[in-house]
Amino acid sequence: WSGIYCGGSAILAHERLSIVDPQSGGQPLYSPDKKVVLAVNGEIYNHREIRKEYAGKYDFQTGSDCEVILALYQEYGIHFLEKLNGIFAFALYDSEKDEFLIARDPIGVIPLYIGYDSDGKVYCASELKALEGFCERYEPFLPGHCYYSKDGKMTRWYVRDWTQYEAVADAPASVSALREGLEK
């Protein structure tokens, strides 16, 4: 199951390992009106709950767990990432707005790289070798971050208190308590 979308100012290509819905979950995935395109590598753990919530509100085209990303985007625009529980790296292209969103899961389980060519065009890929030869510079796409084409920059979307030193500076640190907790 490999697929390619080429339109507007975006090209999305995907080679799929099918675990959930291997028969009809080919990618890229499309919104019902075909205006939003999604290439994703990942697993959305809460996809059943999201599907249930959107029953009757969104016309799911496949049984793919990742299709819920399209339903969430339809309702929330780019502000839906907090609603996902899972591991993922994706590129979503809205052909009507000619905008794209690239995002990676909070801890970076799924690999993703971003690159820029000499004209400033943006590329992303799950393997670094896919960017070589096209990009003048490239770097790892940071976990818990997204890139929205309208803003043209990387933004941290996954923000928790415990990720800031000030929030945990006074927390007791005990190697023996940690060891005991891990051994249980």
Please place each PLM-identified region on the residue numbering.
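Cysteine-centered catalytic environments shared across enzyme families
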Residues: W1-K184
